Regions:
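Flexible "arm" and connector segments at domain edges
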Residues: 1-103
Length: 103
């Protein structure tokens, strides 16, 4: 998969893929908002419609992940280092929650 990801980002260029990432993050946010609105207003037309909203969220998450993986591979970043930093940030946020912080 790494070779394919590098081929894509080298073809379109880093700047283009950065803009694409921004677009895909926006689409993910929009998909989540639509899901929440439908759930809160019960305007989904039934449970099967909620499943469609969830599937759309999954698709948008995949789009964002693909672009993040392209950028990670482009810069030859160490994935275990990213995982370690993510774990530290998660732990820090859990501490904030324990301390009653809301940010």
């Amino acid at each position: 998969m790494k070779e394919k990801l590098l081929k894509i980002i080298k073809h379109y260029g880093l700047n283009h893929q950065q803009r694409k990432l921004e677009e895909e993050v926006y689409e993910l946010q929009e998909a989540i908002t639509r899901y929440e609105m439908a759930r809160e207003t019960n305007s989904t037309g039934g449970i099967y419609s909620l499943v469609a909203f969830e599937e759309h969220i999954v698709e948008e998450i995949a789009d964002v992940c693909v672009l993040l993986m392209q950028i990670t591979d482009y810069f030859k970043l160490d994935v275990p280092s990213i995982d370690k930093i993510m774990e530290m940030k998660i732990d820090r946020q859990i501490e904030r929650i324990k301390n009653g912080e809301h940010n």
